[in-house]
Amino acid sequence: MSRDEIYRQSQSFLDDFGFGESVATVFDDMLERSVPFYAELQRMIAEMAGDFAMPHTRIYDFGCSTGTTLIGLDQAIGPRGLTLVGVDNSQEMLAKCRAKMAGHAFANAVELIRADLNQGVVMENASLALMILTLQFVRPLYRDRLVRAIHDGLEENGALVLVEKVLGESSLFNRSFIKYYYEFKKRNGYTELEIAQKREALENVLVPYKLAENLEMLESAGFRYVDVFFKWYNFVGIVAVK
């Protein structure tokens, strides 16, 4: 696994954060060192998927990146006649995904699709949809519409599993949670320069909502049951059932 050192050196000009080749190459390391309890989150997602993945349906992973979640789902669920559909807008991420998947003997069918979630989604025969640290990168203007489209594309009793970075409900807690998160990143080997430069690159690219705003968006989209299954300061996991 290549180590994430994209922001290791001081840069006089920072491009907006994107998912091109440089990020795709180190993305697995970036996630493991930047997302609290990342391995446990993956295990929990696969565990829940086992309850919602109906035989002979499709599971959509929107923002599948390098395929870690799809591989984990397939291993946990086993053969059910499913089609696992990975959707991403980055050609470089999809290339890394294909390469990683080549080393895994899948028990279910797999499809990879390039698509821009800002333009909506097309789903069929879907029992489960995943958005793991993805919705936060969709332009706020399109989020409500996207979540409604996912709800409408799910079969009855189908589920959406959503993991997001969130804002604190108050400015007091928000400042504290950000401070704790940066301390977490330092413990995982990131320098203050790396943290500051990545924060600047992500500004206006990653736009988090408050937890309450995400819950309201899911309920407004029509989901009957919505609950939080994971919370760590400014990271949250939500499951919603149609």
Curated annotation (Swiss-Prot):
User: What top-level class of enzyme does the UniProt entry assign?
Assistant: transferase
Q: Does the keyword Transferase apply?
A: yes
Query: Which amino acid positions bind S-adenosyl-L-methionine, per UniProt?
Result: Y38, G63, C64, S65, D88, N89, D116, L117, R199
Query: What does the UniProt keyword field contain?
Result: S-adenosyl-L-methionine, Transferase
Give the E.C. number(s): 2.1.3.-
Q: Which GO molecular function, any one, fits this protein according to its record?
A: carboxyl- or carbamoyltransferase activity
Q: Give the reactions, separated by semicolons, that this protein catalyses.
A: prephenate + S-adenosyl-L-methionine = carboxy-S-adenosyl-L-methionine + 3-phenylpyruvate + H2O
Cite a single GO BP annotation.
Answer: tRNA wobble uridine modification
- SUPFAM superfamilies reported for this sequence: S-adenosyl-L-methionine-dependent methyltransferases
Q: What does this protein do?
A: Catalyzes the conversion of S-adenosyl-L-methionine (SAM) to carboxy-S-adenosyl-L-methionine (Cx-SAM).
Q: Which family does it belong to?
A: Belongs to the class I-like SAM-binding methyltransferase superfamily. Cx-SAM synthase family.
Matching PANTHER family: CARBOXY-S-ADENOSYL-L-METHIONINE SYNTHASE, TRANS-ACONITATE 2-METHYLTRANSFERASE-RELATED
Q: How does it assemble?
A: Homodimer.
The protein's name: Carboxy-S-adenosyl-L-methionine synthase
Species in which this protein is naturally found:
Methylococcus capsulatus (strain ATCC 33009 / NCIMB 11132 / Bath)
Lineage of the species this protein comes from: Bacteria, Pseudomonadati, Pseudomonadota, Gammaproteobacteria, Methylococcales
